[in-house]
Amino acid sequence: MLKKLTMLFILAAGLFLLLPPLSERYSITSVFRVTEEPVAITRGTYGSVLTVNISFGDDEVMDWIQALDKPYPTLFIDTDWAERFPETIDLIINKNIPTALLGQEGEVYEYDTELFINQLERFETLFGVKPLWFRTADEVFPVILHELLREAEVNALGSSLTWSGGDIPPVTEGEIISVPHHRTNRVQLLELNRLSESREFQTIEDVIFGTTGKMKKLPK
């Protein structure tokens, strides 16, 4: 009996070692929904996370991305914008900067249920991976959109604070900060240096799940 158990243990250990490890890009958090109920996450449990919504910009965005250092903010990307600037998208991919899908205003999805699927497919074509996170432009998530998100196994992420420049807000544990960069509403990306000097940013997963790790401010 002891000999059989020993052989089974050796066989199991060998099979485990032969299994390929999950890469960082396809971590366990990328294949499971964060919440069981259809709800938009607007706050975590620990630290601060920076998210930047991008639907406008050319050279300024490229220069800012080139200067970014880890840990990176999560970039919520509008697919119409992304398709116009493939070189910027290549840079984002090469630097392995976290990305997510930025949609239109929430009300639009009540009348056009195909829109989200179209945006999702275009995002996958651009980045080669399905986004874990989705945000509408106004952070409004209609019921039908929640259903589409659950079917696609994509999480709805709002924010606890939108920063449009000006005074630096006080730090709140678990905060998810959203910064706009649109044609009619945008923060000069270099202004984010002031925000980064006021707190230390973590990843979305770290803030939501309350894990800790090395933290580093964005470059000046």
Q: What is each stretch, according to the model?
A:
Residues 1-51, 56-67, 200-220:
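N-terminal pre-catalytic segment of deacetylase/amide-hydrolase enzymes
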Residues 67-68, 152, 194-195:
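Glycine-rich, phosphate-binding/catalytic loops in enzymes
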Residues 61, 85, 116, 188-192:
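Aromatic/hydrophobic pocket-lining residues that form the small-molecule binding cavity
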Residues 70-183:
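Metal-dependent polysaccharide deacetylase catalytic core of the NodB/CE4 family, i.e.
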Residues 31-34, 39, 49-52, 61, ...:
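Extended aliphatic helical segments
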Residues 171-210:
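Catalytic grooves of carbohydrate-active enzymes
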